[in-house]
C-alpha cells in the first residue's frame, strides 16, 4: 500500500503558525531539487522551471541537485544541462543511489569541486539508445540522429570530466558501470561523502 508523499511541518518567516507541506516543497525552500525518476519531457520541464525560479530568487546562493535516476530522454537531459549552464547560480550535484545514462551527465555538470557521490552509489555511462522503426529512409535518419547525439554527449562529457575523446567514446560504447571511487577517479564527481 503506497504511503504517498510524506508531509512535514514548515513555517515561513512571515507565517504565524506552521503548515503541513509535502517533503519536496519543504526541501525546495532550501534550494534542493531532486532528479529521482525516469527523465521525460514533463519531468525535465519541472526541473528546468525550478532551476530558473531558484536562480531568479538568488543568483548567489547554491542550488543542490540530488540525483537517483536511471536516466531517460537524452533530449530532456540535455535541456536540463543547458539550463544548468545558462543560470548564474552554482549547482552542487550529489548522487544518492544511481546516476545512469543522461543523469550521469547532469551529475558531472555540477560546479567543479561541488560534485559528490555517496559511498555505495553507482554511475552508468553508455551511448544514447532510441527505439527506431519505420521505412528504411526513416531508420537511416534516426540512426544519423543517434550518432549526432552520441558526438554531442561525448563532447559534453569531456568538457566536464577531463578525459580524452577516445577514452569517453570507448567507455560509452557499451554499458560502463562505475563505483563511487571509480566515478571520482574518472572525474565525474569530486568527492565521496562518508558522513
Curated annotation (Swiss-Prot):
Q: Name the Pfam families for this protein.
A: CLP_protease
Catalysed reactions listed for this entry: Hydrolysis of proteins to small peptides in the presence of ATP and magnesium. alpha-casein is the usual test substrate. In the absence of ATP, only oligopeptides shorter than five residues are hydrolyzed (such as succinyl-Leu-Tyr-|-NHMec, and Leu-Tyr-Leu-|-Tyr-Trp, in which cleavage of the -Tyr-|-Leu- and -Tyr-|-Trp bonds also occurs)
Q: Name one GO molecular function term.
A: ATP-dependent peptidase activity
In terms of superkingdom, the source organism counts as Eukaryota
Broad enzyme group: hydrolase
Q: What is its EC number?
A: 3.4.21.92
Kindly report the protein's main subcellular placement as a broad class: plastid
Cite the PROSITE patterns for this sequence: CLP_PROTEASE_HIS
UniProt cross-references to InterPro entries, sorted A to Z: ClpP (IPR001907), ClpP/crotonase-like_dom_sf (IPR029045), ClpP/TepA (IPR023562), ClpP_His_AS (IPR033135)
Q: Where in the cell is it found?
A: Plastid, Chloroplast stroma
Gene3D superfamilies linked: 2-enoyl-CoA Hydratase, Chain A, domain 1 (3.90.226.10)
Q: Which UniProt keywords apply?
A: Chloroplast, Hydrolase, Plastid, Protease, Serine protease
Q: Which CDD domains match?
A: S14_ClpP_2 (cd07017)
Q: What does this protein do?
A: Cleaves peptides in various proteins in a process that requires ATP hydrolysis. Has a chymotrypsin-like activity. Plays a major role in the degradation of misfolded proteins.
Q: Could you tell me which HAMAP family the record lists for this protein?
A: ClpP (MF_00444)
Q: Which family does it belong to?
A: Belongs to the peptidase S14 family.
Q: What is this protein called?
A: ATP-dependent Clp protease proteolytic subunit
Which organism does this record belong to? Bigelowiella natans (Pedinomonas minutissima)
Q: What is the lineage of its organism?
A: Eukaryota, Sar, Rhizaria, Cercozoa, Chlorarachniophyceae
Amino acid at each position: 500500500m503506497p504511503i504517498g508523499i510524506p508531509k512535514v511541518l514548515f513555517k515561513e518567516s512571515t507565517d504565524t503558525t506552521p503548515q503541513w507541506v509535502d517533503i519536496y516543497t519543504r526541501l525546495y525552500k532550501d534550494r534542493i531539487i531532486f532528479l529521482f525518476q525516469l527523465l521525460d519531457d514533463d519531468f525535465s520541464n519541472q526541473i528546468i522551471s525550478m532551476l530558473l525560479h531558484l536562480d531568479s530568487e538568488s543568483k548567489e546562493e547554491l542550488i543542490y541537485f540530488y540525483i537517483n535516476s536511471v536516466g531517460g530522454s537524452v533530449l530532456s537531459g540535455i535541456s536540463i544541462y543547458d539550463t544548468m549552464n545558462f543560470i548564474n547560480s552554482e549547482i552542487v550535484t550529489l548522487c544518492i543511489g544511481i546516476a545512469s545514462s543522461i543523469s550521469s551527465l547532469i551529475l558531472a555538470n555540477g560546479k567543479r569541486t561541488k560534485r559528490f557521490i555517496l559511498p555505495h552509489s553507482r554511475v552508468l555511462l553508455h551511448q544514447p539508445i532510441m527505439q527506431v522503426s519505420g521505412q528504411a529512409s526513416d531508420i537511416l535518419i534516426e540512426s544519423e540522429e543517434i550518432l549526432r547525439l552520441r558526438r554531442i554527449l561525448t563532447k559534453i562529457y569531456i568538457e566536464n570530466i577531463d578525459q580524452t575523446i577516445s577514452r569517453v567514446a570507448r567507455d560509452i560504447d557499451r554499458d560502463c558501470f562505475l563505483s563511487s571511487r571509480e566515478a571520482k577517479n574518472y572525474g565525474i564527481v569530486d568527492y565521496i561523502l562518508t558522513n
